[in-house]
């Protein structure tokens, strides 16, 4: 659970080293649960960050970075390191921003520069990271989104609980994203598992399922970009909290569902809510996988016989069943605007 103080001395730090969170005001909490692949626990490719004290009294920043590919962990950590370093170094400038256009230019320039750093390495042809960040300056909140992680605001209008999405997922199935990809040498198809993915025209790769990332050099040659989208919102008295999470949360829980869950659980100690939400998401993955496993086992058993070909097929089915048990990393950060809400 993320409620530790952090230091801003990043000199000499490597991207893969985890920075401690700075959450001195005890209003921002986090939880991360590593995923599984073929029923084995993974080291996890998500990273997250919370910066409050180091940015001064009127500014806060928190983010989730969702890595993918063989170097996904390194990608998410490198992105975290670069954003943190820039924001702390530029805090005196950023804290004076009063318009959305200023925030847009700052983060678009930052991500563009970071992408150039990724391109200088040979490690990120097929690996990269998404990002969902929230910057708060006084009573204005800005969501900075790149990929398919998500930010959602929870408000209470009278007795009604309202979920306001503060980001729009960057999926190749989006018409505007698909148009750009097609214009730049890529195509969007559903070759693998019915999920819209990005391929170079007339080729079998890269097969990326998100349309904006850092890294992913091959995919950037066919329309994927590193330009984030920014949404601005003034924080109002009815606004209770904002939650950000990797797609491991949103794949099995809708935005209204997550907001309702947090409202229901925040009556207890708020510092446990991020952990409870992450565990609820993980439990849903487990239930879905149990259902998949049973369905595939039933199908495999109905086709069994004793000949060698069937035995080989049975072994292959077992491999497929294990593959169906993959569980994504789950990372949650929640900022409560008022601890006594």
Please provide the spans of the model-predicted regions.
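PP2C/PPM-type serine/threonine phosphatase catalytic domain
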Residues: 1-341
């Amino acid at each position: 659970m993320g409620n530790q103080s952090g230091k801003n001395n990043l000199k000499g730090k490597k991207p893969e080293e985890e920075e401690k969170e700075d959450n001195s005001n005890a209003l921002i909490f986090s939880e991360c649960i590593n995923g599984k692949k073929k029923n084995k626990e993974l080291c996890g490719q998500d990273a997250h960050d919370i910066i409050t004290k180091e940015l001064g009294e009127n500014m806060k920043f928190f983010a989730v970075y969702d890595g993918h590919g063989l170097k996904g962990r390194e990608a998410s950590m490198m992105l975290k390191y670069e954003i943190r370093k820039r924001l702390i170094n530029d805090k005196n400038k950023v804290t004076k921003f009063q318009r959305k256009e200023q925030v847009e230019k700052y983060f678009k320039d930052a991500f563009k520069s970071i992408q150039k750093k990724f391109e200088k390495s040979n490690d990120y042809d097929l690996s990269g990271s998404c990002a969902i960040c929230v910057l708060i300056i006084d009573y204005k909140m800005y969501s900075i989104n790149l990929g398919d992680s998500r930010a959602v605001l929870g408000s209470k209008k009278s007795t009604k609980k309202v979920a306001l999405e503060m980001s729009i997922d960057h999926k190749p199935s989006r018409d505007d994203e698909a148009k750009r990809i097609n214009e730049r040498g890529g195509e969007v198809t559903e070759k693998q598992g019915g999920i819209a993915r990005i391929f170079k025209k007339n080729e079998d790769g890269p097969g990326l399922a998100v349309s904006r990332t850092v890294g992913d050099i091959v995919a950037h040659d066919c329309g994927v970009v590193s330009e984030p989208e920014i949404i601005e919102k003034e924080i109002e008295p009815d606004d209770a909290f904002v939650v950000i999470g990797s797609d491991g949360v949103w794949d099995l829980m809708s935005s209204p569902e997550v907001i309702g869950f947090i409202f229901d659980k925040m009556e207890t100690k708020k510092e446990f809510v991020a952990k409870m939400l992450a565990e609820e998401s993980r439990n849903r993955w487990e239930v879905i996988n149990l259902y998949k496993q049973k369905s595939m086992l039933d199908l495999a058993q109905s086709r069994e016989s004793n000949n060698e070909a069937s035995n080989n097929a049975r072994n292959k089915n077992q491999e497929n069943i294990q593959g169906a048990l993959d569980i994504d990393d789950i990372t949650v950060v929640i900022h409560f605007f008022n601890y006594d809400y």
